[in-house]
From Swiss-Prot:
Phylogenetic classification of the source organism: Bacteria, Pseudomonadati, Pseudomonadota, Alphaproteobacteria, Hyphomicrobiales
Protein name: Putative pterin-4-alpha-carbinolamine dehydratase
InterPro entries: PCD_sf, Pterin_deHydtase
GO biological process: tetrahydrobiopterin biosynthetic process
Organism for this UniProt entry: Sinorhizobium fredii (strain NBRC 101917 / NGR234)
GO molecular-function term, one example from the UniProt record: 4-alpha-hydroxytetrahydrobiopterin dehydratase activity
Amino acid sequence: MRPEKLDAEAIAEQLHRMEGWVLAEDGASIWKAFRFRNFAEAFSFMTQCALAAEKLNHHPEWFNVYNKVDVTLSTHDASGLTELDFKLAAKMDQAAAGRMPDHLK
């Protein structure tokens, strides 16, 4: 079953609860830059997020260089944002908690 695309009001409400996530200019995706102490922490984060993504059957677009992981979330089947994007964003924030140095949060 295809996830339902969220309207602008629902997206704004969800983003209000999410720290650091930014709505793309086109309104079709959200993104966040995560920074960690080192590569091992970044890779550990990505591994934990990959397992969560598999459970949700919803997968991020991400880019990793050393301690940096840039994430973009969108639901391509809905041509925009759905609840799945915000569920995965919350899981990613949980996975990052405790791994990110305070000065990088």
